[in-house]
Every structure is written in C-alpha cells, then in structure tokens.
Amino acid sequence: MVKRKYLILLLILLFAGAKAQVQVDVKLDSLQLFIGQQTGLTLSVTFDAEQKLQMPDIKKGQELVPNVEVVHVDKPDTAILNEGKRMTVSQAYTITAWDSAFYYLPPMQVMVDTSRYESNNLVLKV
C-alpha cells in the first residue's frame, strides 16, 4: 500500500514537471563561412500554448557580436503541437561576418511568461 502511494506521488510530480518545460534552441545552417558569405541562424522556442512568449528584439543591421551582422530577419513561424496544447515559434535570421576569426555567439534569451530562458551557445568559424 505504501509503495502504491509513492508511485502515485511520483507520477503526479513527473506530469506536473513535464507541463512547465520550455525548450529554447538555436542552430546555424553552416558553422563555417568565408568572409562576407551568409548563413541562416534559427531560434526555436517550444512552450505551453497558454503561455506568453517574448522573442529577442534583433533587427536587420544589428551585430550579434562584433563583425557578425544580421542582414535579414524573417517573420516568425508558429507550429501548433499536441492538439493545441503546445506550440513552437521559430525565428530565422540571415547573418554574415566581415573578418576571419572564431566567433562565440552567446546564448539568445527569450521570456516565457515572467521567466527568462537561454538557448545553447554557438561558435562560427570565418
């Protein structure tokens, strides 16, 4: 009987924790470029549909880090998941670099409701 209570409590905790998960991911189309060549960078956020998402305010012409510039910003793309319970919002950027080096691209930050989440970091070789 005691084992059954612990099992039920464990299942409740697992399902409660799974509901609040937010996943933030950033990917580069190419990790290596020539000077002036362009590549895509995509930021994707998966979260519960009833939550409010605020993406980073990155504009065309802005530098992510010195010498790595955003040359184009696409409109966000939204995918509905799990019969409307979750969603993924993806934002695509086109970037270029103006000098040869290894560039550390720091994590991108998003806000979901009142919590801040960060993506993975990347390294770009030019």
Where are these regions (language model features)?
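Bacterial Sec-dependent N-terminal signal peptides
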Residues: 1-27, 41-42
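Surface-exposed interaction/ligand-binding surfaces
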Residues: 20-126
